[in-house]
């Protein structure tokens, strides 16, 4: 009997870990993760306090925070140098450990959680710029990648898989045990690799993070990851987490369909998984290469993960540079096409599927270009313009009115079902979220949308949160009147600045 009790307790503990790794630990009234790509810790802390917390954002994906090799590429250092680690010390162009802790305290205090992009699949391949094969990290640590010598961890040759290149993406063993883009491939079955990885992640938990984005999860064996994740501490209650909370996991698994040797489903027991096909399907529709009407059934029937397991996004830092898009870059929407991008993001925020993450980018002319920097390679802080947008080379999609207000829509209507689906032709659609919210889209070339549709909302005059917002009892954009029976006349001109309107119960005037 005693052995049965022990087994039951073990199974219950394992189930709690798995369930916990799907929970992002948002504050009530908050949702959505924003990737503040390449931001400094001091700027992130300020953005939490002045914008993200008050506006109801749930959390932030941080760029890698541990030490990486310095790569000098002309006048600009590439963004991808962060993905070439030389140690697990918390030091980067974003700041040091004290800067990180200050950011963590300030963001958690206003209800914004932090998720660190972690690299435990590999170490740096770039030999640095000295010509002697010795790479120098941003914190001064040195490494000799060609010899697999990383003394600041420490890692040596015995901690890596035998050197081989991925030449056959249809071979799952090769994809997991050989070198991704020549990066020395750590062997997560080795005790030292597991110990150092666990120590690194536990230290970040001590510093107040809510979870992790696991880079290159596809290139690691799920069984090894399960061992590492199972050894992590519970989240620290001093940062506002409930006792017993487990770290949220976002695992990067690029799965572009059944032809893949490694499938996303192999990782769902460990947490959420990046759903790249969601990005493709939504982008293809709003680019105009597919009809909006088909999006009504977007989900598992399309080959997507179940909603609980899916981390969904319109774009991410890779596929906006045509990396990991499976040759479908033309169907990936980014800030460079603002009108359809805002429409696609509004759809993703309103459609009740998956855990949503949005991008906050910097402008770039080529795919290697790093963040805005000064003559000494210091990252330049975003400036905030009078209209709330960003300057100094930063896009800040999360501050675009249409996107910010749709995150609020998502928060207000959290947990309500999709109702009252409407379509006219191929590319005019609308749907409600119970008696809470309503959105409509017109992506029909050369045609206006003028329809009387059922919103599901109580009677009243509502402020369209796409064209403006409610200020007191007034609306800075256009207003929409809902009749006693829930119907409303919806008008979206073919050449409207935004091809979408949205109203919700809190935008009633």
Name these PLM-found stretches.
Residues 13-32, 47-53, 57, 64-85, ...:
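Active-site-proximal helices and loops of the catalytic beta/alpha 8
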Residues 27-29, 68-105, 146-187:
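Aromatic- and acidic-residue-enriched carbohydrate-binding clefts of CAZyme catalytic domains
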Residues 1-9:
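Classical eukaryotic N-terminal signal peptides for Sec-dependent ER targeting/secretion
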Residues 20-41, 181-185:
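Boundary/entry segment of secreted carbohydrate-active catalytic domains
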Residues 188-200:
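Alpha-helical scaffold elements lining the catalytic groove of polysaccharide deacetylases
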Residues 39-42, 444-446:
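Short beta->alpha connector loops
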Residues 36-38, 90-92, 216:
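Short glycine-centered, acidic/aromatic-flanked micro-motifs in structured strand/loop junctions
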